[in-house]
């Protein structure tokens, strides 16, 4: 579909961890003739969308499918935890950050048997400890973790964790919300049974559409598992798609049109070229922070290449809210950290941006520091 852009929308550079900066063509893809989402025409659009979502992670359409849900990324965690656990089994959450903690909270809410295997937020999981836990708990049927813990930017070893899950006959689910369609993923090579994401991050579309890419055979088997949710049930949503070509409940129509356009732009840019662009942005963020003297939370070689978490300066004139507002008024959004034991802020390499945007940002950011009297280079005690 040829998207007409009747005027240029004011462009903001979002350096928060999603939603991300979008193109005008994705924005205007939402302006379409009204349509009932139960029409066959719209069902055909969703079928193509679902197939593309599998192809992005190199899934075989004979083995993998995608299932759409209306909601934020957290709905995917809810769906997988409550839908994919057989009766009498338990979940192992490999947890080194806020987003794996969210999976633990979902388990607690539903009363699902689970093990919260916690590691420090600034360290990767110890694979020997993970294997020991699996060996000692043969009733673990599902292992879950987060690919890129967005609160810190640490990259978790999903391929190795998936291999361990499969060694002990468990299904492996991964929250790939902040890596999908950015950092290349291959579900078969990476030992992933289910991954999940939302349209507003790597795809550079809008909030409200989330999706799970997973093994069709496991979804079908889950039809016999306990039904713990009416809306957030994976098999029910999958089965309704397969029988009718429709979402079980009302879909976010305009967001789906925008996501289809975002997918077109993804394929036009290409997986490797897109990842190279995100890498350029990420490197430019590091260069800017290094020049000012900021310190990272996570070791450079353990970062996912998409989120930089930086420590607050030990400077009485540093005020994140004031610096944020200064940048925001000039078209740049920065974001607070999500680490309970450290004061941090985050700069992210998501969205339709390139390294020139980062250079422009650091001019404004440095102005803000100077305006409020923050010492440069940054001081730490």
Report the location of each language-model feature:
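PLP-dependent aminotransferase-like
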Residues: 75, 83-139
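N-terminal "arm"/small-domain region of PLP-dependent enzymes with the aminotransferase-like
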Residues: 1-40
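Conserved PLP-binding catalytic core of the aspartate aminotransferase-like
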Residues: 295-326
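Conserved active-site segment immediately N-terminal to the catalytic lysine
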Residues: 188-200
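PLP-dependent enzyme catalytic core of the Aspartate aminotransferase-like
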Residues: 343-381
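Active-site phosphate-binding strand-loop segment of PLP-dependent enzymes
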Residues: 125-181, 194
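Conserved N-terminal alpha-helix of the aminotransferase class I/II PLP-enzyme fold
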Residues: 29-79, 83, 98, 102-106
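Active-site C-terminal subdomain of aminotransferase-like
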Residues: 21-22, 200-287
